[in-house]
């Protein structure tokens, strides 16, 4: 069984994914945040790092997705699925942070990868307001997330809805 947890930043995905994995005896696959070499740079300058950040996350999540698919003996709970990456990329493109050429490159990579993807058996969407999300981001205190704005979260929320 493959369970995906979806939602904007600060929705509670990691917490729920870990709790479900522990309860069900599944493996938890968390969003690759701590070892992301682009995260702090991205929130500091989205125009400069938007495309590279999204490509990096797309490749990392594809790698994670393949590990989930090939390990069918044990169930998996994934904190943010690869499909959600397209929401971020589209939102960044529409906001002008990723230019047309880079966005089309991203979409091309995703379309090639899509042939090798499977949908989660269950997808849980955690809906929170951008204001609640911002409060949670502030409370967890990740330095790299200090540049996140309410406007960014509102656009992201619209992309999910």
What are these regions (language model features)?
Residues 1-2, 73:
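Pre-Walker A (Motif I) flank of P-loop NTPase domains
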Residues 5:
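Hydrophobic anchor at the beta1->P-loop junction of P-loop NTPases
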Residues 8:
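P-loop (Walker A) phosphate-binding loop of NTP-binding proteins
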Residues 13:
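Conserved lysine of the Walker
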Residues 22-61:
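Conserved substrate/cofactor phosphate-moiety recognition/catalytic segment
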Residues 49-118:
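Glycine-rich phosphate-binding loop used to anchor ATP phosphates in small-molecule kinases
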Residues 87-159:
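A glycine- and Lys/Arg-enriched "phosphate-lid" helix/loop adjacent to the NTP-binding pocket
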